[in-house]
Amino acid sequence: MRVALGIEYDGSKYFGWQRQVEVDSVQAQLERALSKVANEPISVHCAGRTDTGVHATGQVVHFDTDAIRKESAWTLGVNVSLPDDIAVRWAKVVDEDFHARFSATARRYRYMIYNYQLRPGILRSGVSHYRTHLDENKMHEAAQHFVGEHDFTSFRALHCQSKSPNRNVHEVNVTRQGMYICVDIKANAFLHHMVRNIVGSLIEIGLGHQSHEWIPELLALKDRSKAAPTAKPNGLYMVDVTYPEHFQLPKLALGPLFMLD
């Protein structure tokens, strides 16, 4: 039997999604809890691996098991065995041809900026704090240059292992709600650090250090060293994964929960 799960987590205390030998990860905690409920070793596959300190409200995973359980066992039962900063949001038995990564047609991320001169007292691990005023309208205008299929070499990590730097960005929106700025980006897939590198350059534009024409210049240069530094991880959320309709996976509010959809 193959089961898909929707997962949310606060990545602050974890060394990313992927299971590692000597440090704690979201995957390791989830597999431990699932194995306890299934009474057999469980290995999960995710839609996209998140880095150290990055969060998710819409991560999707799947696993195979011989255990026969009610769907509530994979939600309520697993949540009992998970730490408070990881939770299963939904569970669904799926066909054998479903794959959390390879069946996905798009991923969506939101990067949350707290734009105020004084630091936040709450949500400090869930937002990135920038004291100097950012012009979200200029950031949004510049972000439209990313839409479409491009070579994102200037916006990938130097150690990115993806064979191709090409990605198709479906949409990017930069909006403000009071002191919060949200960079909302959807694409077929993302390169390592791609979202945070994009945000880093948009921040330079929001500060007035660069114009919106800088973005197409960076895309053409195909040189990571020419773009801005990588934005901090704590403002980044994986909020949604798109799959073909026939899988009929549950659709919940994207989050983060303090954002209005």
From Swiss-Prot:
Transmembrane segments: none annotated. Belongs to the tRNA pseudouridine synthase TruA family. The active site is at D51. Substrate binds at Y109. NCBIfam families: hisT_truA. Disulfide bonds: none annotated. Its EC number is 5.4.99.12. It is an enzyme of class 5 (isomerase). Formation of pseudouridine at positions 38, 39 and 40 in the anticodon stem and loop of transfer RNAs. It comes from the Bacteria. One of its GO terms (biological process) is tRNA pseudouridine synthesis. Homodimer. Keywords: Isomerase, tRNA processing. CDD domains: PseudoU_synth_EcTruA. GO terms for molecular function: RNA binding; tRNA pseudouridine(38-40) synthase activity. It catalyses: uridine(38/39/40) in tRNA = pseudouridine(38/39/40) in tRNA. This is tRNA pseudouridine synthase A.
